[in-house]
Amino acid sequence: MHERNYAVFRLLPLASLLLAACSVHTPSGPAKSQTSPEWRAHQQSLSALGRYQTRGAFAYLSSQQKVYALFNWQQTSADRYRLILTNPLGSTEMDLNVQPGVAQLVNNQGKRYVSDDPEVMIQKLAGMSIPLNDLRQWMLGLPGDATDFTLDSRGYLHTLNYSHNGQLWTVTYQGYHDDTVPALPSNLKLRQGDNRIKLKMDSWSL
């Protein structure tokens, strides 16, 4: 798997407009503590979600490249998920299936790659550092293994810091869907050094 920056990410920049246009909601009032009943109840509700699907826009920005795509994340169990990246015209650019012990990626030319570590595979093939193993929790609004995190006034996750494989990731939550039960993130930003990842979740299916 020595190929790098292959055609899978030759995407149109239209999706960046979707990310730029997203609204950011910052609740007012004092932040809740990690021991607050609001956070504990919310955390318990999120942890009970075993199957879900979310669709939206994805951006990866670094000094080497800028990648924009639409995404569909399908979580079928705690350790099984599928991530589909499409261009704004609807054509599939990448289809990643992850199961315990094996990850399979198919690019837009139908070429298939298999690895036991999806993060390493994405890094080698596309030159993108994405903390996939933690992202499942972070997308839901859970801190995962992170212990350094803050909450907003409603008891929802607001920021977190987590060291992953020697890299310090900072995650900022910029909005939540109030029409879902429990409330789920609508916008979040990840930063690690010069690398930035932006996710805009347009819809959730539980």
Swiss-Prot record:
Family: Belongs to the LolB family.
Keywords: Cell outer membrane, Chaperone, Lipoprotein, Membrane, Palmitate, Protein transport, Signal, Transport
Subunit structure: Monomer.
Lipid-modified residues, N-palmitoyl cysteine kind: 22
Protein name: Outer-membrane lipoprotein LolB
Protein species of origin: Sodalis glossinidius (strain morsitans)
GO CC list: cell outer membrane
Keyword Membrane carried by entry: yes
SUPFAM superfamilies: Prokaryotic lipoproteins and lipoprotein localization factors (SSF89392)
Membrane topology designation: Lipid-anchor
InterPro entries (UniProt xref): LolA/LolB/LppX, OM_lipoprot_LolB
Main location: membrane
Lipidated residues (S-diacylglycerol cysteine): 22
Pfam families: LolB
Function: Plays a critical role in the incorporation of lipoproteins in the outer membrane after they are released by the LolA protein.
Signal peptide (from-to): 1-21
Phylogenetic classification of the source organism: Bacteria, Pseudomonadati, Pseudomonadota, Gammaproteobacteria, Enterobacterales
Localization per record: Cell outer membrane
One GO term (biological process): lipoprotein localization to outer membrane
